[in-house]
Amino acid sequence: MDTVLDPFTGLDSFSSSYFDDDDFFTDHSSRDHLDTDDFLDEDVDFLTNQIQEYYKDSRISQDGDYCDVGNFSFSSSSSTFSYGCADSTSELSPHRDGGLLKRRRRMRSEVEMQQLRQAANVRERRRMQSINDAFEGLRSHIPTLPYEKRLSKVDTLRLAIGYINFLAELVQSDMPIRNPHSDALNQPKKVIICHRGTRSPSPNDPDYGLPPLAGHSLSWTDEKQLKDQNIIRTAKVWTPEDPRKLHLKSSINNIENEPPFNFIS
């Protein structure tokens, strides 16, 4: 053994136990495992500092809060890191997948909450304004009686439904007249006459020198002849209900208007 180590100078400083002839070529696999805590102290301290710096930067950029170095600890027997922030503690395993920390929901400040409330109030006011404008347009298209105050939304919808039903009845009653399969011979014929007028030959006329005009003439009847023949015309007239009287009725389920009656003129 001494002959082998002769070329290597400076080995005298090592303990003789390292070069024991009995132990130098002995298989140490059968020996008990050595305690690794002494060998891992420096690595653990390095990793702890790196993890602390990482979470310190992350907390400052997000929440402005971070964990202290003293909250980190290492245990060689369990091979786990533990840390604690504020009042909470959790365990981090090297074999666990996913992030090391759950992102905490950022708490909104009082200024942000006030801005959100103001924005919600503005949206609600705009929504109510659009609804009121729509009801005003509906009131302007419905024939109503001269009321002392403006109609409510419920009364406006009730009158609108009745007026729509009345118009639907008028359309249905007018369908036979507009039916193309009806007898066309019984319909009064309209005479259309096409003529071409001539311009005045007088130079003093404003139309002098212009080309002749083309026009049409339609047949027409005199309204006075109808009166002389005692002809009576009838028409359907829709009378809106008075909302003030609806509250006096026992049943308010029927929101349609009463059937229209014939108006004799």
UniProtKB/Swiss-Prot annotation:
InterPro entries recorded: bHLH_dom, E-box_TF_Regulators, HLH_DNA-bd_sf
Claim: Nucleus is one of the keywords in the record: yes
CDD domains named in the record: bHLH_TS_PTF1A (cd11417)
Annotated Gene Ontology cellular component terms: cytoplasm; nucleus; transcription regulator complex
SMART domains, alphabetized: HLH (SM00353)
Function: Transcription factor implicated in the cell fate determination in various organs. Binds to the E-box consensus sequence 5'-CANNTG-3'. Required for exocrine pancreatic development. Plays a central role in directing the differentiation of retinal progenitors towards horizontal and amacrine fates.
Protein's name according to its UniProt entry: Pancreas transcription factor 1 subunit alpha
